[in-house]
């Protein structure tokens, strides 16, 4: 199947996801080697166009591009013509005319990558759009899970935290359910959007129910900057009822994985002792991010392989 863009995981097949993850395993060998340089993207140009702040996602895309010998450039909206009023489409068309092969975009508006993709010849990768999707984060999460669990079919993944504002949660639900995993969400009712169960996941009444016999326990950051009003009484009350603590983690399987997309609010959605425990693969998620993004860029520039 040929695919010009990766705008989300909604509608992406199991075969496509498996192909990306298999390719990422090969790219991980490059990331772990002493010579992090290949010629896979030699002659290609990659631009990261970020309208929101980012550390992990932007840096991993930039490193992925450079490890494969692409010409890589970063555009910050605040330091470009966007600050002068240039539209997203005009910016995209300008980059297109400069011969850009892939545009990686992060934008506060849901659907912005889809809009951009309709107006440019370059491949467009969604690096996070509003509260919609963050497909590469879900792919790196699945790569990390698959490496430790041996597969995703039948795995129970508990996702705990600010589901309402989380594009990571949505992409993980799409991807994990496609791969046959069982996704369980838990959060205060005010942080669970309506009709989430229609996406193929279940909603647990308590974090204890979500963690029970789970293969993976994933925390989500409480995104206070996206909240228009207080959706829970206080941080202290949130912690009392919903924080991932050692006691709650103990309800999961003995070797259950602890995950978090970052950045973390330690002592809010996840206890520091849990984030740093032997079951935590949070730092490995970062490594997986570079490998997944290398794989995706490689495959998008050779569309017959996607």
Label each PLM-derived region with a short phrase:
Residues 35-143, 266:
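Phosphate/diphosphate ligand-binding glycine-rich loop within oxidoreductases
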Residues 255-256, 261-306:
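Adenosine-phosphate binding glycine-rich loop
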Residues 68, 119-121, 179, 197-200, ...:
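Short, structured coil segments at secondary-structure junctions
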């Amino acid at each position: 199947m040929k695919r010009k863009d990766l705008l989300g995981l909604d509608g992406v097949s199991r075969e496509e996801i498996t192909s990306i993850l298999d390719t990422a395993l090969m790219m991980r060998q490059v990331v772990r080697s002493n010579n992090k340089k290949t010629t896979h993207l030699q002659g290609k140009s990659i631009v990261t166009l970020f309208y929101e702040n980012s550390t992990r996602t932007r840096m991993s895309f930039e490193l992925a591009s450079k490890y494969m010998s692409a010409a890589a450039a970063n555009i910050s909206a605040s330091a470009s013509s966007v600050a002068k009023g240039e539209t997203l489409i005009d910016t995209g068309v300008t980059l297109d005319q400069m011969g850009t092969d892939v545009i990686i975009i992060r934008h506060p508006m849901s659907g912005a990558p889809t809009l951009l993709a309709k107006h440019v010849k370059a491949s467009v990768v969604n690096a996070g759009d509003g509260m919609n999707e963050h497909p590469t984060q879900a792919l790196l999460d699945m790569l990390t899970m698959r490496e430790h669990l041996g597969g995703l079919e039948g795995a129970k993944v508990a996702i705990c935290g600010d589901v309402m504002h989380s594009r990571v949660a949505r992409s993980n639900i799409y991807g994990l359910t496609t791969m046959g995993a069982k996704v369980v969400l838990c959060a205060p009712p005010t942080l669970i959007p309506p009709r989430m169960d229609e996406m193929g996941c279940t909603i647990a009444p308590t974090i204890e129910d979500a963690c029970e016999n789970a293969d993976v326990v994933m925390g989500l950051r409480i995104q206070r900057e996206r909240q228009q009003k207080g959706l829970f009484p206080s941080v202290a009350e949130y912690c009392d009822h919903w924080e991932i603590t050692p006691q709650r983690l103990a309800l999961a399987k003995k070797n259950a994985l602890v995950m978090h997309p970052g950045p973390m609010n330690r002592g809010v959605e996840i206890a520091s002792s849990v984030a740093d425990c032997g079951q935590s693969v949070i730092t490995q998620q970062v490594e997986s991010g570079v490998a997944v993004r290398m794989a995706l860029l490689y495959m998008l520039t050779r569309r017959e392989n996607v």
